[in-house]
Every structure is written in C-alpha cells, then in structure tokens.
Amino acid sequence: MANAAKRVLVLNGPNLNLLGEREPEIYGTATLADHVAAATSQAAELGLHLENMQSNSSAEIVNTIHSARGVYDAIIINPGAFTHYAWSIHDALAAFSGPVVEVHLSNPSTREVWRHESVIAPVASGTIAGFGGSSYVLDRKSTRLNSSHT
C-alpha cells in the first residue's frame, strides 16, 4: 500500500501576485501562476500534494496558518515584505507543529539593509533564498527531508 502524499501548504505574501510584472530585474519574468505550476509538478514527483494561497493581508495569512493545524504536514512560506515585521505571522507559525520552510526568490541579505532581518526565520526549519524560481523547487525537497525527521 502506497503512502499518502504529504500535504503542504504554500503561502505567498504581499505583492507576489505581481510577479512577472513587478521589478523583473530582481524577481524575474515568471508569474506566481508559473511558479505554482512548476512547483506542483515537481512536488508530485516527491510525493507531496501542494495547496497554494496568496494574500496581501497578514490577517488572512494568520487565519490560514491557524486553519492548517492538523490538516497539513508542512508549510512553505514566502512572506514577502511581511518577513521583516509580521510578528503575528511568526506567532502563528510557532503554533504549527510541522516543518516550516521560509523561501525568497531574491536574497534579502544582499539587498537593502531593512531587508536583512527576518522575524520568520526563528520559527522556520530553514530558509532558502536567492535562487529565483528554483527556490520553490528547492523548498519542496527540503520539506520532504525535514518532514522525515520530525
């Protein structure tokens, strides 16, 4: 009997709905839908079932994380600008019992100084940053590894 696919919630924060249009020199020309399609395909090969959500509202992200408890095996989050100040998202992720992977298309530590600190990192199993769209593929693999150790 085959193991059931692990359920992974993928959360994308503010302005990520504008990928492909907003600052393509930093974030590339692929849209969020492009990243989701590629990641979903790759995840299936790894035995993961992804469900994706994007919001420009921290309250909506917090409520989604609360609802994920007991439903999802892991969370992958690109918090966007919420990375640097959204303590409510930090606290919600801290209450989630599975692995959490923080992902960024760009490398925040090589950009403006205000982007260097993450309030999400302390509650994440790991962070993947700076690999463009490949970050979404890399994070699925890391989630599979992390979840086998929890």
Residue ranges of model-derived segments:
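Short acidic/histidine-rich motifs immediately flanking catalytic phosphotransfer sites
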Residues: 68-75
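Glycine- and acidic-residue-enriched helix-capping/strand-helix junction motifs
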Residues: 19-34
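Flexible, gly/pro- and Lys/Arg-enriched active-site loops
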Residues: 82-138, 142
